[in-house]
Regions:
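Residue-level "edge-of-site" marker
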Residues: 21, 56-58, 187, 223, ...
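Active-site cores that bind ATP or allylic diphosphates and position pyrophosphate for catalysis
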Residues: 57-200, 206-211, 260-274
Length: 274
């Protein structure tokens, strides 16, 4: 966490509140927020919006071998959704492990993404009843980030467009718990030559690696600004210089494939983006 924040600050970016590279803030660690997540899960249970699911990971993987729907994968078919209280108690007595899933309503969720425009989707289209807490007690991403956003009063969420299918799920949790729903902006991804999303296997393109190799942070920002349509050419630039030129509507919707020219610009001429 500290190294990540240090890399972000090296890029010339800063933030208004929260931990810093010099000072941690335990309230921002999800591992310290389990009591809050537990209370919110209990609230969903009391509203009959959460139910125990006894399906194993193997069961879910088998279900996922069915034809996928969109980017969210195969929907969970609700195998345990309508178990009677007696059936639930019997399975618990038998020692079967269970997770907790959100009971998805049939109604569509609508929101306007600041980049991709109006969106409408049912939770079934986004994977069906989703996990809130795993059988080992770990809270799911969907519950944790929704509660964090609501509890901290987050008004704008900016992230990669691969998380667009998660948005209706998070809106459902936020609304069920009485939280305000933030604005969402999903941005296109950087891809390698094989059109795969940049990931851990591209370690040489991590901020830490680029920084260690002596790449100028202003060149990184300049490349990203050009890709995002904020500037009309690659040129070194400080983030502060881009603030007045930034417009959500100028952002492209298509992912960007990094090229050899981009590597040359960053001073990484001998690297293949694959």
């Amino acid at each position: 966490m500290q190294a990540l924040m240090s890399d972000i600050r090296w890029l010339g970016l800063d933030w208004d509140e929260g931990p810093t590279p010099e000072k941690e803030d335990p309230s921002y660690h999800q591992s310290n927020r389990y009591p809050l997540y537990t209370a919110k899960l209990e609230q969903l249970k009391s509203m009959n919006l959460a139910y125990p699911c006894f399906c194993s990971r193997r069961d879910v993987r088998t279900m996922a071998s069915a034809p996928h729907i969109g980017d969210a994968g195969a929907p969970y078919p609700g195998t345990c959704r309508n178990l009677s209280p007696e059936e639930v108690r019997e399975r618990i007595r038998e020692g079967k492990k269970y997770s907790w899933r959100f009971r998805s309503p049939d109604t569509p969720y609508r929101f306007t993404d600041m980049v991709y425009g109006p969106q409408t989707a049912t939770l079934q289209e986004c994977g069906g009843d989703f996990n809130l807490q795993r059988s080992d007690g770990v809270f799911s991403y969907q519950l944790a980030v929704s509660v964090d956003d609501g509890d901290m009063g987050i008004t704008q969420v900016v992230r990669g467009r691969d998380l667009l299918p998660s948005t209706p799920r998070q809106i459902a949790v936020l609304e069920a718990l009485g939280y305000a729903v933030p604005q969402y902006a999903h941005i296109p991804l950087l891809l390698d030559a094989e059109h795969e999303r940049l990931a851990k296997r591209h370690a040489s393109l991590s901020l830490e690696s680029l920084r260690q190799d002596g790449v100028s942070p202003w060149r990184i920002i300049g490349l990203l600004a050009w890709v995002a349509g904020i500037t009309d050419r690659r040129e070194p630039v400080h983030p502060r210089e881009l603030v007045s030129s930034f417009r959500w509507e100028s952002l492209p919707r298509d992912d960007y494939v990094l090229t050899s020219k981009d590597m040359q610009w960053l001073g990484k001429e001998n690297m293949n983006v694959c």
